[in-house]
């Protein structure tokens, strides 16, 4: 049998294309080199907790059509992302808002906060020449030093003075007490995890796992009229122009025999000395409850570090 489409990768993009193609009456084969569907949004159940295997993913969109589409497969919870920044034991709200400014400077009104930021931004004159100058021109020296500099340098493995200014086009500054990281109208986490969402989207579609497309390209290309490839583009072209400078990360998992480690789904570590950039405590994506609504006695952590 020759398929209309061979879709390489079973992440959100691949699953969406596959589902829509099948709906349009096309024949589809989905392959993935991993032993599971879901790509980088894959979740697995550990100790009753849906663990985000490849880092945290919070679904958010302003597009009602998109929201209606994903919620037609599974229900979503009401999770909103409100990360915390930890700078050497000092805790700050993210994104930068009035809670952040009050902790940083003791200001209590939006007018005071705006004046403080404007005062510190004056340090930079002219066009910012690097990321450090760009960040200071947006939020001032204090916030840059505690909440931007170390975190960014860990992520990129370079001094902020050696990074281009365009990496930080803008830094969201809110003169309100709104801790919601995203401004999107619709946001949440699929109840039961992202893997459940992908499995629902791929119902009735042939899926082959543990298949490496690039190692079997010539043979696999014969199976379909068209190929839709969703993997790394430099790998597809066999690195003929070199490798792209992806920001790569390393994940380390830990299970603790305690109900609560940090009290929040995401805590960013913004000092340069702490080796990891973020700790994810997965249970708080679903409010610390299992699928039956019971409190979970253990907790699962994901340490994210630059590799």
Where are the regions a protein language model picked out?
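Short His-Asn-centered micro-motif
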Residues: 8-10, 31-33, 61-62, 192, ...
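Glycine-rich FAD pyrophosphate-binding loop
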Residues: 23-44
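A conserved beta-strand/loop capping segment in the N-terminal third of enzymes
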Residues: 42-51, 59-110
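N-terminal Rossmann-like FAD-binding beta1-loop-alpha1 element of flavoenzymes
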Residues: 5-29
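Active-site/ligand-binding neighborhood in enzyme catalytic cores
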Residues: 85-92, 98-226, 230-237
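A glycine-rich beta-turn/hairpin centered on an aromatic-Pro dipeptide
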Residues: 264-267, 276-286
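Central helical "cap/lid" subdomain
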Residues: 210-273
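Conserved small/polar residues in nucleotide/adenosyl-binding loops
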Residues: 303-307
């Amino acid at each position: 049998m020759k398929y209309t489409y061979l879709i390489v990768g079973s992440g959100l993009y691949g699953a969406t294309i596959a589902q829509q193609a099948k709906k349009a009456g096309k024949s589809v084969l989905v392959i993935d080199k991993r032993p599971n569907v879901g790509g980088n949004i894959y979740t697995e159940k550990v100790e009753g907790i849906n663990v985000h295997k490849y880092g945290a993913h919070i679904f958010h969109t302003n597009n009602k059509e998109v929201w209606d589409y994903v919620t037609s497969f599974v229900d979503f919870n009401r999770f909103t992302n409100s990360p915390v920044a930890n700078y050497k034991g000092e805790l700050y709200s993210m994104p930068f808002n009035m809670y952040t400014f009050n902790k940083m400077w003791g200001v209590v009104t939006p007018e005071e906060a705006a004046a403080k930021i404007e005062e510190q931004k004056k340090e930079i004159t002219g066009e910012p020449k690097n990321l450090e100058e760009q960040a200071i021109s947006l939020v001032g020296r204090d916030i840059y030093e505690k909440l931007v500099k170390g975190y960014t340098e860990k992520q990129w493995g370079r001094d902020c003075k050696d990074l281009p200014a365009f990496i930080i086009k803008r830094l969201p500054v809110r003169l309100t007490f709104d801790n919601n990281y995203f401004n999107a109208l619709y946001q949440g986490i699929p109840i039961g995890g992202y893997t459940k969402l992908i499995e629902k989207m791929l119902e009735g579609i042939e899926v082959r796992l543990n298949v490496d497309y690039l190692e079997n390209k010539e043979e696999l290309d014969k199976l379909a009229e068209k190929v839709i490839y969703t993997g790394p583009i430099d790998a597809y072209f066999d690195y003929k122009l070199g490798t792209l400078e992806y920001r790569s990360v390393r994940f380390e998992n830990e299970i603790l025999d305690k109900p609560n480690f940090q009290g929040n789904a995401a805590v960013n570590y913004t000092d340069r000395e702490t080796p990891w950039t973020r700790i994810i405590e997965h249970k708080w994506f679903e409010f610390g409850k299992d699928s039956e609504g019971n409190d979970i006695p253990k907790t699962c952590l994901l340490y994210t570090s630059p590799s």
